[in-house]
Regions:
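Beta-lactam-recognizing serine transpeptidase/beta-lactamase-like catalytic domain environment
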Residues: 2-6, 12, 74, 219-229, ...
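Periplasmic/cell-envelope proteins involved in peptidoglycan metabolism and beta-lactam response
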Residues: 1-294, 303-306, 315, 337-343, ...
């Protein structure tokens, strides 16, 4: 009993001590709080009014872009923007007047920028003018005290070293739009951020975009920096190395000067794009700062559509280049053999309609090889009649026509390989047998992009390797990996089918065929020309002075016959005959490629072969 009473007294004693300690601590805290608020409060208010923390965004440079041989294509240059810190504004009307009158910003533009700035948040500065001149910098510096809310902010700007060269591949950057922010097209972006708008700048925007840093400084109420608090450095974006070869790209651009068309060169074995030029073009440097409304309207209203990449975003009838795919269909279906011959008199009647060959007097009796060499229409009209449109379409699709290639560039078109079902679905009309005859020589409803045609012919060159074209070679960044899904599909097509087609293509270039203007001494170039009729002969006479009625020009080929290393397609809108207009363009690309190869081999001879040589 006594023990219980003793424990009870001990408990109450400890409780009293604990309560006493709590009371003492409370009194100490209350005293300190009273001191801070009453005694020292005015001093802290004064300091808070005099000094504020300002967070300055350190914009991360985008990653650089180079060609396959490390030739720089896209870099960054130093630039300054004029920034408005809204939390530092004392007199809004005075600030607006200063920005408009002294810095030359239109009132309506400033209103838009201020409205968009509200979306970004109060403590994110509004960019009121980009990439400013020395004169603007001088004005800001001279008015620092009167307008501390206006500051200069460094920002790296995109610089495309060679102007319009490879513009459609590289693309350009621009300010993220409100719609793109709402759609989360570029996650994590805010108004004022620059993002890729086209080309690899867009496709690999995430790889190229770095991580912004920040600097925290102490500023006075008039905006003068009085102390440094902390800094987190910006992290530069990943570097891209492309598959392009600068020399081939430059040559393709020069060959297209003053023309409307495209030239694409590709490694047929793996789909690496060595050159992709489209004309007319544009200078992406004009987008590095906000492009003027006048310049933008001029670009989008240009009837030749310079922003369009004709390699992948336009589709055209393939003309006589489609005869290669017709040959593949005929051979695979067993409708062509060594003994298959057709007599060409210059014209022929099919389904009660008269169809003509391009050679009025005819080619006489021709087999498959000669029909490719001479590009005889009558042979392929007859082959089309035997095959029918469904078999023609099936083999064309198998070789990659009429569908996107999957290239790592935006805006690629499908093209069309027509069938009766397609016509019914898209036009609500019946397929006529005569349409099959037109399709058999690449006319009528069929259309392909130049890259699709190049990919299909590359499959012929490599005995059935259907590649996925791409422009990215590698990404250099610790956190990014180079895509490795450049799949190659091996087509189930007989080797003899490809051999016989290549025999005809070789003869077209090297045996007085329509592609002879692509021939290079010492190199077995294989190719096929195409000339696409834009308007009927009856109307042609009425409009003979109009350039828009001229035929489209094609040439597609590869080299060499037994060791395909490069495939080239050249296309000119309204260029005339393919053998005259397009074939010489391809020849120049082939010539540069093999000249470079010879220089490399001379500089770095094969040591193994040299060691095996005997006197």
């Amino acid at each position: 009993m006594k023990a219980q009473e003793s424990n009870k007294q001990l408990f109450h004693l400890r409780l009293n001590w604990t309560l006493g300690l709590v009371v003492v601590l409370f009194l100490v805290l209350a005293s300190r709080l009273w001191q801070l608020q009453v005694i020292q409060g005015p001093e802290y208010v004064r300091l808070a009014e005099q000094n504020r923390v300002r967070t300055i965004q350190l914009v991360a440079p985008r990653g650089t872009i180079s060609d396959r041989n490390n030739v720089p294509l896209v870099e960054n240059r130093s630039a300054f923007n004029i920034l408005l810190y809204r939390e530092s504004i004392k007199d809004m009307e005075a600030t607006k007047q200063y920005v408009v009158e002294k810095l030359g910003v239109k009132p309506e533009d400033l209103a838009v920028k201020m409205r968009r700035g509200k979306v970004a948040g109060l403590y994110r500065p509004v960019v009121v003018k980009e990439d400013v001149s020395i004169d603007d910098i001088s004005v800001v510096e001279a008015h620092k005290r009167q307008h501390p809310e206006i500051q200069l902010g460094p920002e790296p700007r995109r610089h495309y070293r060679h102007g319009s060269l490879a513009a459609h591949v590289l693309g350009y950057v621009g300010e993220v739009s409100e719609d793109e922010i709402l759609r989360e097209a570029f996650p994590g972006t805010a108004p004022g951020d620059l993002v890729g708008k086209s080309g690899v700048e867009r496709v690999y925007n995430q790889n190229l975009t770095g991580t912004d840093g920040k600097r925290e400084v102490l500023v006075t109420s008039v905006g003068r920096e009085v102390g440094f608090l902390d800094e987190m450095e910006a992290q530069v974006g990943g570097e891209l190395q492309l598959t392009l070869d600068f020399d081939l790209q430059e040559a393709a651009e020069k060959l297209l000067a003053g023309k409307v068309g495209t030239i694409v060169a590709m490694d047929p074995t793996n789909g690496e794009i060595l050159a992709m030029a489209s004309a007319p073009s544009f200078d992406p440097n004009s987008f590095s700062t906000r492009i003027s409304e006048q310049d933008w309207n001029q670009l989008i209203n240009d009837p030749n559509r310079p922003l369009q990449n004709r390699s992948i975003q336009n589709s055209y009838p393939p003309g006589s280049t489609f005869k290669l795919f017709m040959a593949a269909a005929g051979l695979e279906e067993g409708m062509i053999s060594e003994s298959t011959h057709v007599y060409c008199s210059g014209s022929g009647v099919f389904y009660n309609h008269l169809f003509h060959c391009h050679k009025k007097e005819g080619h006489g009796t021709v087999g498959l090889e000669q029909s490719i060499i001479k590009s005889c229409n009558i042979f392929f009209y007859e082959l089309g009649r035997r095959l029918g449109i469904d078999k023609i379409a099936g083999h064309a699709l198998e070789l990659g026509l009429g569908e996107r290639t999957g290239i790592d560039l935006p805006g690629e078109r499908n093209g069309v390989v027509p069938t009766p079902e397609w016509k019914q679905q898209t036009r609500g009309a019946k397929w006529f047998a005569g349409e099959t005859i037109s399709v058999s020589i690449g006319q009528g409803s069929i259309s392909v992009t130049p890259l699709q045609l190049l990919r299909g012919v590359s499959a012929i060159a490599t005995n059935g390797r259907l590649t996925k074209p791409h422009v990215l070679l590698r990404v250099e960044h610790p956190n990014d990996e180079t895509p490795s899904d450049w799949k190659v599909l091996q087509l189930p097509v007989a080797a003899d089918t490809f051999k016989r087609i290549k025999d005809g293509m070789w003869g077209s270039v090297n045996n007085s065929g329509t592609g002879h203007n692509a021939a290079i001494p010492g190199v077995d170039i294989c190719g096929k020309t195409g000339t696409v009729q834009v308007i009927g002969n009856d109307r042609r006479k009425e409009m003979k002075k109009d350039l828009a009625i001229e035929d489209h020009s094609w040439f597609v080929g590869f080299g060499s016959r037994d060791n395909p290393e490069i495939a080239v397609v050249a296309f000119l809108e309204h260029g005339g005959m393919g053998g005259i207009a397009a074939a010489p363009l391809a020849r120049e690309i082939f010539s540069i490629f093999y000249a470079k190869k010879q220089r490399r081999e001379t500089a770095h001879p094969d040591v193994t072969q040299l060691s095996e040589a005997r006197p």
